[in-house]
Structure formats: C-alpha cells, structure tokens
Amino acid sequence: MVMPLRDAAEDVGRVIREGLLHPVFQPILDFRAQAYLGFEALIRGPASSPLHRPDQLFAAARSTGLADALEHACREASLRAFARLGLPGRLFLNVTPGCLLDDRLLNGETCRLLNDLGIAANRVVIELTENQQITDLPGMHEGLLHFRRRGFQIAIDDLGEGFANLRMWSEVRPEFVKIDKHFIHGIADDRMKYHFVRAM
C-alpha cells in the first residue's frame, strides 16, 4: 500500500511521538553451550496500521526524512522492553551505519538509558545493517571505536550478501557475524561454502 507523503509523515511522526512501536525478540542460540546467546530486537508498528510491517514503516520514515528519529525510537523501545522482560544474554540492536554518529548515540544518552535500566553495555551488540551505502568510512570507524571503548560489541548482518558487505567485515572486524543464508544452505555438501564460513 502506497501512502501519500504527507500522510506518511504524519503517521510515522505519530508512531514515534506516541510510543506506538512494539519490539519483538528473536532468540539467538549457542548450540555448544545449549543456552541463549541473546536476542535480536525486531520492531513492529501499530497492529491496525499499514505501518505494522517493518519494511513499510521504515520505507515511510525514509521517504519523509524521519529515518534517524525512527531508528532512535526503536532502540529506546527495544532496550526498555528487553529490560522489562528480563531476557537473558545479549541484546542485538540493528543500527544503520549512517546512525553511528547520531548525537543521541554519541552524547551518552544511550549509556544513561542502559544505566537507568540496569543493562551492562557489554550485553549490547550493535548490529550493523547494510540497507544504506556507507559514504563516511572514517566516521563509521570513529563511531565504532566510541562504542567499543564503552564495552559494546559489534555484529554485521547478512555477511556475504554483497562485495560492500565483505569490505565492511574486513574494515570493522566484528565480534559476531550473521552469514547470508546462501552460504549456509547445503553447506554440508559444498566444500567451498564450508571453507568460506570457516574462514570467518
């Protein structure tokens, strides 16, 4: 469903202002330890709205200049829900590379919220998503260094999906990678895929 631009801006703005975001948590399992490694925070908009689906919610936010504000609101809602539910392990938070230098991330606001919620920074993993082109590599490094110094860890989503993604992996050197499903499907019978994944 395509929404008129003005309606989209009003609807996304209302979702942000009124706290109408609903985090859901996808478990990440550690098979060796037979325990939860953590949970990835995913977001949904209001159930009765076209913005319930995250692809439509974020597309509307991007088209109306509200993408950074929405991403910030998603992080806050996810952190609060994670603490309220008392979930074990790490929290994987999706962050676009362009938002790494967002003042609300760098000025200590996120760390203060973590402190208020009783969540240690070393339980939070910043998961870089590649849904936008990286135009400021030095800036991205600066942002990552800022968070690593405070105890956060870094993950990359869908490693192997494209050349830019592989470059990001070599530049960022993340603590965690999520490997694109192409390299996992049939890995038991494909030595090339097996060695690629082992090399990660």
Regions found by a protein language model. Give the residues of each.
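Aromatic/hydrophobic pocket-lining residues that form π-stacking "cages" and hydrophobic walls in ligand
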Residues: L57, S78, T110, A199-M200
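The cytosolic transmitter module of two-component sensor histidine kinases
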Residues: A8, E71, M140, N165, ...
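Catalytic core of bacterial c-di-GMP phosphodiesterases, primarily the EAL and HD-GYP domains
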Residues: A67-G139
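A cross-family glycoside hydrolase active-site/sugar-binding cleft signature
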Residues: V24-Q26, L42, F92-T96, E127-T129, ...
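The catalytic core of metal-dependent phosphodiesterases that act on cyclic dinucleotides
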Residues: L114-I187
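Active-site core of bacterial EAL-family cyclic-dinucleotide phosphodiesterase domains
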Residues: M3-A60
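Alpha-helix-loop-beta-strand connector modules within alpha/beta enzyme cores
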Residues: F147, F196-M200
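Short acidic-capped amphipathic helix/loop micro-motif used as an active-site/signal-coupling element
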Residues: A47-L51, R75, L79, D158
